[in-house]
Swiss-Prot record:
Alphabetical list of NCBIfam families matching this protein: PRK00179.1
Catalytic activity: alpha-D-glucose 6-phosphate = beta-D-fructose 6-phosphate
Organism of provenance: Rhizobium meliloti (strain 1021)
Annotated gene: pgi
GO terms for biological process, alphabetical: gluconeogenesis; glucose 6-phosphate metabolic process; glycolytic process
Annotated EC: 5.3.1.9
The protein's name: Glucose-6-phosphate isomerase
Length: 541
């Protein structure tokens, strides 16, 4: 693998692959040769620093890393999360073919379908008013209490699919900061509110702290007996859920082969289903399944997740770019960059291989971004003229949902395409000076100002185009990036499905809480931590 990466570095130098502008000038067919489509989903990577020899080298890299074999092992239900000894089967949750998926010799699809059916019945009953609050009033507001994968996915998808909302209002509480739950409760009528507590073990400290506050809100306003009417849970800890006061009929489970950041397809997606209805949720699953089938069957050069992963690895380890910007030109995808940040950085932010050896490559890049056009007035300056090259990943729909505002969507599309073109083309010193002198500036002043208006260009970007942001399209986008993360993890030869860095933070916070509460001394902690504890306790009221 290391030798193949070094060969790719040599090829990139020999072919001047990073001169993307020259590549377009030399090849009028570059777009058609370095783009591919799956139904209405278009993937354009012609503005990336690649050529035929680079793609050949990346294909050889994928074969050497056995990416396709690892992919097949995941879909087969093999134990690929080796540190937790688990299969990785979020794909089974959206397996619309209903082909058997075996874990330990047992087909999981009957259980998957049973939970999906129970979710649908519960969502229908909440939406129709068949299930009411303790005082007989229809539920108008649903609050999801979770954190991490139990929050980011539902929040992102609910915002993305706002045009399809025809159910109760949705709210999300995640942060243990009391301001989050307090601000949400001020918006609610306890008689018409339902809380969904999303925690597989029902022990997640942030979630259970917020759930206790919500429980006190209902019990205090409506009485202890009302609690069961105003809560549901997504959990497998039936005993703990029961002790909390939630009836087993209102508990929806999922499995240890579903990681939190991959769980939007599971019962964690219940709030989304309540918002958009079970039929639209089904279309969401259909979109994810469509990408699964494409990922499993398409040849590498037409396989969008495979290409996306290979280009990501290439940008990080051949060209040395340390981050990537996710830039959806779709306001309703406002939380999609944050969702992908968790998906990518929690999955591939690892330093040890599957063989328990140090990784020989640079692993997950920093993933960040904002929707366009907002980002253009914030951080695009750095992408265009900063000293680091930051590959950009644009997303744009051909159609918005606001038919009477078509002119605004046209402006949005123009901005998206203009940014990708500008990143590639740039502006030379001569062009910058000519622009200034054409406006009447004298040569001496233009010579001084022009360097500030130079754009080096050759900044790589890729663009994903889809028809319209609907449940099916969103399902495809999420699955596309899930599999991209898988491909990169396979190339790194790491376990993309554990998260011991997250667990470390939980352990340390649990140990420090008694010190913050004043029950234990800070002795044994470093001087910085002890000093910060002392300062906080001194100022606390």
């Amino acid at each position: 693998m290391k030798a193949l990466v070094e060969n790719l570095k040599a090829t990139a130098r020999e072919t001047d692959a990073t001169d993307i502008r020259a590549a377009f000038a030399a090849d009028p067919n570059r777009f058609s040769r370095f783009s591919t489509a799956f139904d209405d989903l278009l993937f354009d990577y012609s503005k990336c620093a690649v050529n035929d020899r680079i793609i050949d080298g990346l294909e050889a890299l994928a074969k050497a890393a056995k990416v396709e074999e690892k992919r097949d092992a995941m879909f087969r239900g093999d134990i690929i999360n080796i540190t937790e000894e688990r299969a990785v089967l979020h794909t089974a949750l959206r397996n619309r073919s209903n082909r058997p998926v075996l874990v330990d010799g047992k087909d999981v699809m009957p259980d998957v379908n049973a939970v999906l059916e129970a979710m649908g019945k519960f969502a229908d009953d909440i939406r129709s008013g068949a299930l009411k609050g303790a005082t007989g009033k229809k539920i108008t507001d649903v609050v999801n209490i979770g954190i991490g994968g139990s929050d980011l996915g539902p929040v992102m998808a609910t915002l993305a699919l706002a045009p399809f909302h025809d159910g109760p209002r949705l709210h999300f509480v995640s942060n243990v900061d009391g301001a989050h739950i307090a601000d949400t409760l001020t918006l609610l009528d306890p008689e018409t509110s339902l809380f969904i507590v999303a925690s597989k073990t029902f022990t997640t400290i942030e979630t259970m702290t917020n759930a206790a506050t919500a429980r006190a809100f209902i019990a205090g306003k409506l009485g202890e007996a009302a609690v069961g009417h105003h809560f549901a849970a997504v959990s497998t800890a039936l005993d703990k859920v029961g002790a909390f006061g939630i009836d087993a009929a209102r508990v929806f489970g999922f499995w240890d082969w579903v990681g939190g950041r991959y769980s939007i397809w599971s019962a964690i997606g219940l709030p989304l289903m309540i918002a958009i209805g079970k039929e639209n949720f089904g279309r969401f699953l259909d979109g994810g399944h469509a990408i699964d089938e494409h990922f499993r069957s398409a040849p590498l050069r037409q396989n969008i997740p495979m290409l996306l992963g290979l280009i990501g690895f290439y940008n990080r380890n051949v060209l040395g770019y340390p981050s990537r910007a996710i830039l959806p030109y779709d306001q309703r995808l406002t939380r999609f960059p944050a969702y992908l940040q968790q998906l990518d950085m929690e999955s591939n932010g690892k330093g040890v291989t599957l063989d328990s050896q140090p990784v020989e490559f640079s692993t997950g890049p920093v993933v960040w971004g904002e929707p366009g056009t907002n980002g253009q007035h914030a951080f695009y300056q750095l992408i265009h003229q900063g000293t680091d090259v930051i590959p950009a990943e644009f997303m744009i729909a051909a159609n918005g949902h606001e038919k009477d505002l078509r002119h605004q969507h046209q402006l949005l599309m123009a901005n998206c395409l203009a940014q990708s073109e500008a990143l590639m083309k740039g502006r030379t010193l001569a062009e910058a000076k000519a622009q200034l002198t054409s406006k009447g500036m004298d040569d001496a002043k233009a010579d001084k100002i022009a360097p500030h208006r130079v754009f080096t260009g050759n900044r790589p970007s890729l663009t994903i185009v889809y028809d319209q942001l609907d449940p099916f399209a969103l399902g495809r986008l999420i699955a596309l990036y899930e599999h991209r993360v898988f491909v990169e993890g396979a190339l790194f030869n790491i376990n993309s499905f554990d998260q011991w860095g997250v667990e470390l933070g939980k352990e340390l916070a649990t140990g420090l809480l008694p010190v913050i509460e004043g029950k234990e001394s800070a002795e044994g902690h470093d001087s910085s931590t002890a000093g910060l504890v002392a300062a906080l306790l001194k100022a606390a009221r």
